[in-house]
Amino acid sequence: MITIKEKRKTRIGEEFIFSLKAPISFSNAIRRIMISEVPTFAIEDVYIYENSSSMDDEILAHRLGLIPIKGKPLLENEVITFTLEKEGPCTVYSSDLKSENGEVAFKNIPIVKLGKGQRIQIECEAIPGIGKVHAKWQPCNAVYKQIADDEVEFFVETFGQMEAEEILEEAVKILKNKAESFLQQLEMIEQ
């Protein structure tokens, strides 16, 4: 049984505290899935057409990859395309990333500072992935403490891509699918 204790917005997402009556092994499975197997969007492919800034292309691409992208992936091959075109002098922020079908979680993340006459023109694609592959797809941090023999209290801090309840629901679905798959494999062995 899950009991929600507290939920509050922070400047980088949400903090979500809930208790769960379940064995420790089950609680740890939920925690691990929340961190590393719930799919989110992150910028993976970056096409740099022009970059006269002082930042190397590789560093610029890496910075873009770590900007949280809002949304829950519905399809495995779903792609969100962003474009960025800016000329200095100015500071380029995540709000300068433009898309018809996506949105950055935070508009005030500085990407690069452009001097007079410097310019960048970029196209990038955000794709679904999981934190097990790369931390840029990690939707939250999650820890728990044991408060009784069969009860733990979770503390979850999200990074803006998804709501905390969505992450928890998705983790439970993933664990359920894994358990069902395991049972099917056991049935095949018994036959």
Swiss-Prot record:
| Chief site of localization | cytoplasm
Its top-level enzyme class, in one word, is transferase
**Carries keyword Magnesium?**
no
Q: Indicate where this protein resides in the cell.
A: Cytoplasm
Q: Return the GO cellular component terms, semicolon-separated.
A: cytoplasm; DNA-directed RNA polymerase complex
Print the keywords alphabetically. Cytoplasm, DNA-directed RNA polymerase, Nucleotidyltransferase, Transcription, Transferase
Q: Which reaction does it catalyse?
A: RNA(n) + a ribonucleoside 5'-triphosphate = RNA(n+1) + diphosphate
Q: List the GO biological process terms.
A: DNA-templated transcription
- InterPro entries according to UniProt: DNA-dir_RNA_pol_30-40kDasu_CS (IPR001514), DNA-dir_RNA_pol_insert (IPR011262), DNA-dir_RNA_pol_RpoA/D/Rpb3 (IPR011263), RBP11-like (IPR036603), RNAP_Rpo3/Rpb3/RPAC1 (IPR022842), RNApol_insert_sf (IPR036643), Rpo3/RPB3_RNA_Pol_subunit (IPR050518)
- GO MF term list: DNA binding; DNA-directed RNA polymerase activity; protein dimerization activity
UniProt-listed Enzyme Commission number(s): 2.7.7.6
- Read off the SUPFAM superfamilies from this record: Insert subdomain of RNA polymerase alpha subunit, RBP11-like subunits of RNA polymerase
Q: Out of the domains of life, which is the source?
A: Archaea
Q: What is the protein's known function?
A: DNA-dependent RNA polymerase (RNAP) catalyzes the transcription of DNA into RNA using the four ribonucleoside triphosphates as substrates.
Give the record's subunit note. Answer: Part of the RNA polymerase complex. Interacts with Rpo12. Forms an Rpo3-Rpo10-Rpo11-Rpo12 complex upon coexpression.
Family, according to the entry, reads as follows:
Belongs to the archaeal Rpo3/eukaryotic RPB3 RNA polymerase subunit family.
Q: Which PANTHER family match?
A: DNA-DIRECTED RNA POLYMERASE, DNA-DIRECTED RNA POLYMERASE II SUBUNIT RPB3
- Name of the molecule in the record: DNA-directed RNA polymerase subunit Rpo3
State the species of origin: Methanocaldococcus jannaschii (strain ATCC 43067 / DSM 2661 / JAL-1 / JCM 10045 / NBRC 100440)
